[in-house]
Amino acid sequence: MRLSLTKVVNGCRLGKIINLGKTGDHTMDIPGCLLYTKTGSAPHLTHHTLHNIHGVPAMAQLTLSSLAEHHEVLREYKEGVGKFIGMPESLLYCSLHDPVSPCPAGYVTNKSVSVWSVAGRVEMTVSKFMAIQQALQPDWFQCLSDGEVSCKEATSIKRVRKSVDRSLLFLDNCLRLQEESEVLQKSVIIGVIEGGDVMEERLRSARETAKRPVGGFLLDGFQGNPTTLETRLRLLSSVTAELPEDKPRLISGVSRPDEVLECIERGVDLFESFFPYQVTERGCALTFSFDYQPNPEETLLQQNGTQEEIKCMDQIKKMETTGCNQEITSFEINLKEKKYQEDFNPLVRGCSCYCCKNHTRAYIHHLLVTNELLAGVLLMMHNFEHYFGFFHYIREALKSDKLAQLKELIHRQAS
């Protein structure tokens, strides 16, 4: 695996990760995202419908929490999780936790980390964790770490220091066991940067992890509420400055379009794509614009779309003041609302996804209010394609030095 940078502008990194996978014949563009999955499958979608989506990332994200209870079956299967789930050609990255599902705190010790499956808590020692990775045989996997400390809330310096110490100890033990394993020789360990909101510990974690022979870095614990954004971004800039240029940087828990752009400007390469899934689960469709050089002939359509965005933002503000449905963002529209009952427009004008080419907002509204499973399928197809298209436009904007225009467009739509 090798990271090839073609351009670095104001911290933003444009390039490719080449020689990926066990055969070394895969590539992945950066900045980019991973394909979010549930137990190895894209939510709501079959493999056939997934193949109808344009721009699907080369690497899928699996979560250890959803696969841990099946590791004995996979160990007996002996051919890895990729073939087992019907994705033998895909690159696979195994993370510890599902970014959508919060984990209870207080279950990390000096010897183990807990993950939470459908059946409950699964305690992971280093040896058990590496045995499961041997059964899964992923291309990349997140190292075991103490990720209970984040920027979300203030934590004592003593607890933050313990988090960094534990994570480094877990990393050393995992690297030792990887050396002893023939099966995992072609798998890449991703080192985890911890440290909460304490600058000194963040920098120590970054410097010490960079000394180890890891294939890349996961920036953990940077998710949080808007009030902590400035602090998080300052920490992020300092951490990425300590990391080597020739290894990829992933970030967990960050997926909103406006936050993605802020992180890219601070040197982050890869993101999780759970945001489209969350939008789908709310019965919403992504409608934000990322075309920073619109066709003049489409100006009228763009103006109509802008008016709708303004109405949507006003509605969100009203909901926030009443304490209702605060999760909905200005990047989406809520198709459960009655006003879409007779709206025969596509979800997004000009969108090339299967849903927009074949169905209308009114039809999706009908599917949602009647609780039809097809609603989730069509919304997931659209939301994934829209989100993956956003990353394509980010790369194009970097190539043409237009990221500032794209960022301005996205922030005008953010609430």
From Swiss-Prot:
InterPro entries: QTRTD1, Queuine_tRNA-ribosyltrfase, TGT-like_sf, tRNA_ribo_trans-like. Heterodimer of a catalytic subunit QTRT1 and an accessory subunit QTRT2. Belongs to the queuine tRNA-ribosyltransferase family. QTRT2 subfamily. It comes from Pongo abelii. Non-catalytic subunit of the queuine tRNA-ribosyltransferase (TGT) that catalyzes the base-exchange of a guanine (G) residue with queuine (Q) at position 34 (anticodon wobble position) in tRNAs with GU(N) anticodons (tRNA-Asp, -Asn, -His and -Tyr), resulting in the hypermodified nucleoside queuosine (7-(((4,5-cis-dihydroxy-2-cyclopenten-1-yl)amino)methyl)-7-deazaguanosine). One of its GO terms (cellular component) is mitochondrion. SUPFAM superfamilies: tRNA-guanine transglycosylase (SSF51713). Zn(2+) binds at C351, C353, C356, H382. The keyword Membrane applies. Its cofactor is Zn(2+). This is Queuine tRNA-ribosyltransferase accessory subunit 2. It comes from the Eukaryota. One of its GO terms (molecular function) is metal ion binding.
